[in-house]
A protein has these predicted regions:
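N-terminal capping segments
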Residues: 1-54, 80
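...with weaker cross-activation on analogous glycine-rich loops/strands in unrelated enzymes
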Residues: 41-101
Length: 101
């Protein structure tokens, strides 16, 4: 899997909205890392959040996250992660189970 820069990652993620390559149900972390062409590094969004060094974490509203950032949410169970676009979040399962929006 080739690594992608921010523009390429967001383009790939936007393509998944209109031309999905798979069902992304409960695969938010897989979707986000796939957008950048990254290999698996943790079994869930919450596990990856806990692996990130404190000095690399930015707490605050999702709107303040930089473009291309992973935005984490403390949902019950595995947590949730989305990808920050310019003015919105690209997420799995938000609009419909398994879909990207």
């Amino acid at each position: 899997m080739a690594h992608r820069d921010i523009d390429q990652a967001l383009a790939w993620a936007n393509d998944e909205i209109h031309h999905p390559t798979r069902d992304w149900h409960e695969l938010c972390l897989s979707f986000c890392r796939s957008s950048y062409g990254l290999p698996p590094v943790a079994p869930s969004a919450i596990d990856l959040w806990h692996k990130i060094p404190h000095h690399h974490k930015h707490h605050g509203p999702a709107e303040a996250a930089p473009r291309g950032a992973f935005v984490y949410f403390d949902y019950p169970g595995a947590g949730h992660v989305t990808l920050k676009a310019r003015h919105t979040l690209i997420s799995t399962d938000y609009c419909h189970p398994g879909k990207v929006c």
